[in-house]
Every structure is written in C-alpha cells, then in structure tokens.
Amino acid sequence: MERINVTPRSDYKEKIEALGFDFHGDYWREEACYRFTTAEIEQLEEATREAYRMYCEAAEYIISEKPEFMERMLQIPPEICKRIRESWDQDELSLYGRFDFLLDERGVPRILEFNADTPTSLLEASVIQWQWKEECFPECDQYNGIHEGLVQSWKDIFPAGSDIHFAGALDDHEDTGTLQYLASTAMEAGFSTRVLDMNAMNLQDGLFYDPSGERIRRCFKLYPWEWMVNESPDGCLAQVEWLEPIWKLVMSNKAILSVLYELFPDSPYVLPCYLSR
C-alpha cells in the first residue's frame, strides 16, 4: 500500500454534495490517496472471505452450542434469543456488512471488528470515491463493486416488485444519506421504496405500519438491534422481513471477537481477544 499526496479538487465540496454527500464535514479529505497492488487487493479479498466464514462459524457456535453466551455475555433476553435462533436456522438473508482491518508490519490484514448491523461509509466508498477516481485518475481501477453488488442483492433477497421501507434516525444526516442511497439502489433493482423515521413506525398486534397506514412487510433499518431490543422488545418479534436480520445482533457485538480467537487462534487475520467476565 502506497500513500500518494495529491492536490484536492478546488470544487470538490460542491461536486460531492451534488451527489448527496452533504454530511462529509471534515473527514472527506483529498490531500492524499492510497494505491494498492493487485496482489494486495487479492490478499484483502481473501482475508474478507475468510473473516466472514469465521464469523459465520462463530455465530453458529454461539447460537447452536453456547446459547447461554447470548443471555449472559451479550445480555440478550431469552425471547429475543429464541427469535435469533429461528432467524439463523431459517437462513434469513443479509444485505451487507463492513469489516474494519488494520495492516500489520508484514502487510497482513488483521480484524479489528465487523460492522455487521448498521455499517455506514457506503455512499462514500461506492459513488463518491468512484467520481473522484474517474476525474482525477481515470486510468486506475477502483477496488470494489459495491453499487452493482447492492443492486443485484436486492433482486436476490426480495421478490420482484416488492415494496421496501427504509427506516432510521432521520435527524442524523449520515444515516439519512445512507438510507437514501440504499433506497436508490433498490429502486434501480426495480423495487418500490419509502424512507421513514424509526419513530414513525406504528406497532399494532405484532405488525408494523407506516404513517399512511400501509403495513411494513419488508424493511431495511439503519438502527442497531441492541437499541431496538432495549426500546421495543415486542417490535423485535414483529412480522417483518428485516434487513439486517436479527441474527446480526450476535455478529455485531464485539464480544464475538473473543469467540473468534477461541475458535481460530492460529488464523493470521485474528487478533488475541479475551473477555474479563
């Protein structure tokens, strides 16, 4: 990986805000970029595949063999644990997640965490970075197919023509921007979408309804399962096809890193991790 100093575009703020990235603040910087070799990219791809495989094995171990870990260490109520097991056993599909890696002194990716439930930095990585690259380095390639992958995944997860609600904390600009971008990818895939605030969802008799009275059957929520478990346990059990599925609650808790190290202590991607209680 090579850090390269570059000259920022004089009008970059106007350009990225025109693409919906109006929550960039000071963290989008164009003074430098990073160049990877093909071998480094292939190593990251392999590390990501292997990391997700290990996370799935760790989740299976916790959900199927160590359910007391969910209640005791993750502090998940028994009725929610039961729903997690059902969700996992039914292979409820996931849309996406984000691994955070560091590169050690040998250049080997090491897992810091898996943002399994409410990952952001999505619009930036898929659209904004691409526009910058095309304008500044058109001869180079971008290492990701996020946008195309999202469009295809909607088709793989939900029946054609479905209505999909997108819910989150709309008073947060980053969450709103992420939801609007995700909704646009679903629309590109041929789905009808509605974006609403989590507080606008009305729970009645185990069903959720939007402000217009329409039943919410399929919903992507950019809202942590941990919060929902605390605020609305009954809502967690409602008849909704959620993205992300509720089994992501297990993967998103950093306590799973200790299980990952227990199961895969010799993996080059896993850092030592222990629980103090």
Where are these regions (language model features)?
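Preference for protein termini
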Residues: 1-277
